[in-house]
Amino acid sequence: MSNFVFYDFETSSSNKQWGQIIEIGAILTDDDLNELDRFESRSRLSPGIIPEAMALIVTNTSPKKLKTTNLSHYEMIRQFVEKLKDWGKVTFIGWNNIEFDQIFLRNTLFQNLEYPFNSTTNGNNEGDILNLARAANL
């Protein structure tokens, strides 16, 4: 079986085309859900990005905090891409990730000149716990 990556993004906006991923949390597990590794990173807001007020409330952050983080958005994405390469073939799991996080990730990877379809190619898969919960509620 495959290893799993459980992940979540905090973003500056609900707009998947114009917002920015500001924080990444990801945990690699084996197929018995034993934690093997983790990735946690936060970046400062890129110039020209204006965060939505509701996004600041949901992510429990402030404009000041978004400006004072040392890591640039590009550096954070590069580190995440390298971590994913280290982890190899995985199944990406999240809550509402197919409709939100994966679209944000694809747009972000494309904007940073990285391959945008890593979660569905090269032996990788994706799953959405929200869809599982919806199916269980039928």
Residue ranges of model-derived segments:
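Short alpha-helix plus adjacent loop in nuclease-associated cores
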Residues: N124-L138
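Short, surface-exposed basic-aromatic patches at helix termini and helix-loop junctions that form
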Residues: F110-E114
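Conserved non-catalytic scaffold segment of RNase H-like nuclease domains
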Residues: S2-T108, S119-T120
